[in-house]
């Protein structure tokens, strides 16, 4: 959002806020007497809103950290103040060492609609309900044995995806946008883990893809009312609420026919049906798997492909490693990816540079605690800036340069690449501690398999000679490309 738009928004909010105050209708929320970490000076009503424009949120906050330190406070309108953590040691204290103290959530009001009033894994506070739901997902659907039993189906889907890409690109001089293909492939993978291996509902695949796209779009415009409650009556916010309800109805119509079935015992749906959950919670839990799994996996794969288009030497080095494992005479198998250290390094470097959730999900203290020895009151909101941590030059030398080699032990004797142990512990793409992403292992596996397969089958290059793909970011809770990758693909001859 450019500075002109931010100026307009700020002006409107100031006028509305002053009017509300003069009319005696402003809320008088009593903030804690806690001494908040020093941050930029706030203005009445709008807090620090005027200082949060001009770039994507995580970059703005990373720049503020250079001025105010690795732990500081920002005030976003009528929200409680938010503590921003931009250093790995402090992040580790919040996420791991005192994980239970910081395990509650602070979610935008609009998320209530699609989360059964915050009754899912990502939105609910830690407690018996959260623990049971997370245990069901990981201990039933996402067990290594259950995931491995579907490798042959992943490989079949990948073969179909590659054939579709080739056919579609052939009609357009080899030009292709890979994102939508990868989204639908991920929906199929997750659907089998949710409903069973015999899942074949293409209507759900396409419908869920479009529903998730709409939720991401709406989320980018619906957060103003969380900061300024008097904005809840604005037509734009009411429109966003209506749109979310409409998307929810579409999702319900896609999922409901499957709920009445008798799912296999190794599926997420089976677990959900064995609990005392109403239909709204079951649908919310299923939607959450898609919501957190589809865009994150597909978009990270496309970010990786974008870097490989820009860095052809790295792409060819990766291709040679893949061929060394496959022998060049067969397609990539899921089991192959753990034999490819350079592939793993490319993945890590992609997630370092473009963490899919650069500010993670907001944490809230569940009790009085401390940070760096200073008291933090119960109910305080903390956001960890993963982007800032991943771009710390003291940990990652030349942090804005794409260098997978920094994560390889056999070349890491070069001190200019950084300390590999420190870098590994500072890579928090899936967060850390008790609220670490429940689907982390599946996400890493699908990302590695998808990337290896696409590089094995196609050479990826610029769609227009000499014009490198854009790395600009469009942040709507997750880190998307402002201009999704369009590349030229050429079949490789093995």
UniProtKB/Swiss-Prot annotation:
<dbReference type="GO" id="GO:0047053">
    <property type="term" value="F:(S)-cheilanthifoline synthase activity"/>
</dbReference>
<dbReference type="Pfam" id="PF00067">
    <property type="entry name" value="p450"/>
</dbReference>
<dbReference type="InterPro" id="IPR017972">
    <property type="entry name" value="Cyt_P450_CS"/>
</dbReference>
<dbReference type="InterPro" id="IPR036396">
    <property type="entry name" value="Cyt_P450_sf"/>
</dbReference>
<dbReference type="GO" id="GO:0004497">
    <property type="term" value="F:monooxygenase activity"/>
</dbReference>
<dbReference type="GO" id="GO:0020037">
    <property type="term" value="F:heme binding"/>
</dbReference>
<dbReference type="GO" id="GO:0005506">
    <property type="term" value="F:iron ion binding"/>
</dbReference>
<comment type="similarity">
    <text>Belongs to the cytochrome P450 family.</text>
</comment>
<keyword id="KW-0560">Oxidoreductase</keyword>
<feature type="binding site" description="axial binding residue">
    <location>
        <position position="437"/>
    </location>
    <ligand>
        <name>heme</name>
    </ligand>
</feature>
<dbReference type="GO" id="GO:0033075">
    <property type="term" value="P:isoquinoline alkaloid biosynthetic process"/>
</dbReference>
<dbReference type="GO" id="GO:0005789">
    <property type="term" value="C:endoplasmic reticulum membrane"/>
</dbReference>
<protein>
    <recommendedName>
        <fullName>Cheilanthifoline synthase</fullName>
        <ecNumber>1.14.19.65</ecNumber>
    </recommendedName>
</protein>
<keyword id="KW-0472">Membrane</keyword>
<dbReference type="InterPro" id="IPR002401">
    <property type="entry name" value="Cyt_P450_E_grp-I"/>
</dbReference>
<comment type="function">
    <text>Methylenedioxy bridge-forming cytochrome P450 involved in the biosynthesis of isoquinoline alkaloids. Converts (S)-scoulerine into (S)-cheilanthifoline, a precursor of sanguinarine. Catalyzes an oxidative reaction that does not incorporate oxygen into the product.</text>
</comment>
<keyword id="KW-0408">Iron</keyword>
<keyword id="KW-1133">Transmembrane helix</keyword>
<keyword id="KW-0812">Transmembrane</keyword>
<keyword id="KW-0503">Monooxygenase</keyword>
<keyword id="KW-0349">Heme</keyword>
<dbReference type="InterPro" id="IPR001128">
    <property type="entry name" value="Cyt_P450"/>
</dbReference>
<keyword id="KW-0256">Endoplasmic reticulum</keyword>
<feature type="transmembrane region" description="Helical">
    <location>
        <begin position="4"/>
        <end position="24"/>
    </location>
</feature>
<keyword id="KW-0479">Metal-binding</keyword>
């Amino acid at each position: 959002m450019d500075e002109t738009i931010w100026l307009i928004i700020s002006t409107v909010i100031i006028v509305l806020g002053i009017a509300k105050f003069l009319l005696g209708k402003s809320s008088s929320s009593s903030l804690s007497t806690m001494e908040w970490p020093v941050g930029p000076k706030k203005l009445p009503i709008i807090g620090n809103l005027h200082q949060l424009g001009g770039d994507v949120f995580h970059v703005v906050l990373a720049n503020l950290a250079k001025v105010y330190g690795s732990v500081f406070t920002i005030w976003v309108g009528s929200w409680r103040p938010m503590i921003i953590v931009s250093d790995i040691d402090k992040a580790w204290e919040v996420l791991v060492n005192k994980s239970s103290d910081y395990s509650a959530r602070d979610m935008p009001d609009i998320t209530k609609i699609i989360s059964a009033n915050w009754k899912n894994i990502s939105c609910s506070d830690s407690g018996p309900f959260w623990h049971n739901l997370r245990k069901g997902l990981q201990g039933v659907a996402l067990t290594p044995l259950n995931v491995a039993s579907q490798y042959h189906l992943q490989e079949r889907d990948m073969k179909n995806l590659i054939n579709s890409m080739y056919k579609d690109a052939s009609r357009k001089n080899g030009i292709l946008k890979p994102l939508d293909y990868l989204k639908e492939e991920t929906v199929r993978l997750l659907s089998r883990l949710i409903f069973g291996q015999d899942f074949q509902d293409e209507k759900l695949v396409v419908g869920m893809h479009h529903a998730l796209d709409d939720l991401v779009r709406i989320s980018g415009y619906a957060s103003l009312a969380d900061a300024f409650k008097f904005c809840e009556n604005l037509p734009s916010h009411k429109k966003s609420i209506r749109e979310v309800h409409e998307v929810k109805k579409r999702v319900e119509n896609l999922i409901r026919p499957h709920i009445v079935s008798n799912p296999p015992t190794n599926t997420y749906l089976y677990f959900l049906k064995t609990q005392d959950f109403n239909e709204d919670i079951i649908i919310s839990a299923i939607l959450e798997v898609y919501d957190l799994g589809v865009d994150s996996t597909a978009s990270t794969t496309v970010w990786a492909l974008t870097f490989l288009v820009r860095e052809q030497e790295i792409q060819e080095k990766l291709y040679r490693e893949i061929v060394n494992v496959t022998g060049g005479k067969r397609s990539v198998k899921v089991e192959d990816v753990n034999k490819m250290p350079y592939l793993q390094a490319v993945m890590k470097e992609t997630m370092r540079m473009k963490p899919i959730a650069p500010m993670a999900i907001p944490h809230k203290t569940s009790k009085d605690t401390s940070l760096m020895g200073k008291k933090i009151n119960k109910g305080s909101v903390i956001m960890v800036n993963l982007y800032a941590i991943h771009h710390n030059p003291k940990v990652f030398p030349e942090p804005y340069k794409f260098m997978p080699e920094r994560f390889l032990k056999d070349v890491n004797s070069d001190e200019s690449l950084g300390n590999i142990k420190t870098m590994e512990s500072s890579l928090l793409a899936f967060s850390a501690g008790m609220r670490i992403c429940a689907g982390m292992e599946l996400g890493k596996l699908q990302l590695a398999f998808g990337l290896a397969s696409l590089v094995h089958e196609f050479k990826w290059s610029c769609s227009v000679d000499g014009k490198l793909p854009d790395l600009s970011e469009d942040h709507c809770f997750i880190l998307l490309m402002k201009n999704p990758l369009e590349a030229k693909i050429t079949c490789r001859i093995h």
